[in-house]
Each structure stands twice: as C-alpha cells, then as structure tokens.
Amino acid sequence: MCPPVRQRPAQAPPAKRQALETVPHPQNRGRLMSPKARPPKMQRRPRPPVAKRRRFPRSPQQVERPILPPVESTPQDMEPGQVQSPPQITAVIQLRQERDTMRPPIYLPALLANCGPAGLLRAHRLPQPKPPCQSRQRPSPDSQTSPC
C-alpha cells in the first residue's frame, strides 16, 4: 500500500479568514495561519558569538631572556661608602655564557637528523640499529659498503 498523500490543512472558517486577511502579515498570506510567537531564524536578532572552550588550552609562550653582560666594577670607581655587589652573580652570568658558547652542538640521532621530528614518532616501529662490527678488520675509507 502506498503511504497516505499529505493534504493541505483545512482552511479557517470564513469569519476567521476575513479577520486574518485584514491583518497585514504578507508572509502569512499564503498559509492563512496566525502569526508565530517567534519570528523565523533569519529575522531574529543574531546573538553575539560565544567564546569557544579549548580542550587543550594554549601553553604560555616561553620567552628566552637575554643574557646580561657581566658587570665589571673596578675598585677605583667605588666610593668608600658603597657596598660591592656580590661576586657570585657575575660568576653565574659568566658561567652561563661560557656554558652556552663552549657546549658542543646537541647530539641528534641519525633518525632524527634524517627524518626530522617525525622520526621520533616512527622510532618505536623500526628495528634496533646494528652495532658496528668489532671482529672484522677495518674497511678501507674509500669503500662504500659496510662489512656488516
């Protein structure tokens, strides 16, 4: 059996129809229904957008502060009433500068150097790298293939 065909709703009785037609609602002229309590969505006043909640809030930016040059105070500049600044502060600054300049570059495994940060994600899936062979003699430096 076929589903029932939707029919138009029954028209209002003539007295109500006349009252509705006299009220100026051009959008309701076709359906002859009473005006809605809320206007349709496009005519409503838009609500200001709500601030979206973040599932993972943003981390605060980590600002690298510049390293101050060491303060060098000579005894002839100092007046007798002045107290000399503690020397450990300048020593810490000097140590930090030396540490930053004298430190060798950070060691990066070959996987990270070749594949970038994605290599770290793939590292657990790859087989362990073979240790270099100690038993055989050293290959000549111009040979391309390794003895392993």
Curated annotation (Swiss-Prot):
Q: Where is the composition biased (Low complexity)?
A: 1-17
Q: Which InterPro entries does this one have?
A: DUF5451 (IPR035221)
Q: Which domain of life is it from?
A: Viruses
Keywords attached to this entry: Early protein
Cross-referenced Pfam families: DUF5451 (PF17532)
Annotated region (Disordered), positions in chain: 1-86, 122-148
Composition bias of kind Polar residues appears in 134-148
Keyword Manganese attached: no
Record's compositionally biased regions (Basic residues): 38-57
Q: Does the keyword Kinase apply?
A: no
> To which protein family does this belong?
Belongs to the Epstein-Barr virus BLLF2 family.
Q: What is this protein called?
A: Uncharacterized protein BLLF2
